[in-house]
Amino acid sequence: MNALILCVGQLKERYFTDACHEYLKRLTRYGSFELREVPDLKIADRSGTPGEDGLTAQEREVIRREGEALLKQIRKDDFVVALAIDGKQLSSQELSDMCLKWRMNGRRTVLVIGGSLGLSPQVMARADYKLSFSKMTFPHQLMRVILLEQVYRAMTILSGEKYHK
């Protein structure tokens, strides 16, 4: 499998970076896996009235600009999977089946994790598939670890290894 995990923001906590590096190291036996970060943008002015979407104009601008940075990393022929609360929830076995399809389609799979404000409408429109791990909201830093662990679990299922229970 050829995959890019594309994220907004840089991990600062060592326990998250250590976990991500461990799963990326484990995944190397199953293909090419890369973790790439784009900068998260700070909101200069937290004042402002939220619109119908619950976001202020400044927050919408941050989401738009982060989305542009993400889209610059995505190639035209990539298969894009956006992590989104309203995406499809899968079991580990079903994710394994999806990973097999993604591996067989011959395209690079790009798994996109948004920042604290989520993904822009433009990134969501570019997504070929929307994946959800829960209806709950997780910190985007933790979501990287969860995603990498689940992809690793999916790869072990495909390989018939004992990791998956």
Per-range role (PLM):
Residues L11, I85-K88, G115-G118:
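Short glycine-rich anion-binding loops that position phosphate/pyrophosphate groups of nucleotides
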Residues L6-V8, R36-V38, V112:
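Short hydrophobic segments within beta-strands
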Residues F33, P39-R107:
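S-adenosyl-L-methionine/SAH cofactor-binding core of RNA-modifying enzymes
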Residues T17, H21, G67, P121-M124:
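Short, surface-exposed alpha-helical segments at coil->helix boundaries
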Residues M1-L27:
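N-terminal beta1-alpha1 ligand-phosphate binding loop
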Residues N2, R107-V112:
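Loop/turn-to-beta-strand initiation segments
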Residues S32-E34, Y129:
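Conserved beta-strand segments of alpha/beta enzyme cores
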Residues L117, P121-K165:
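Structured adenosyl-cofactor binding patch, chiefly the S-adenosyl-L-methionine
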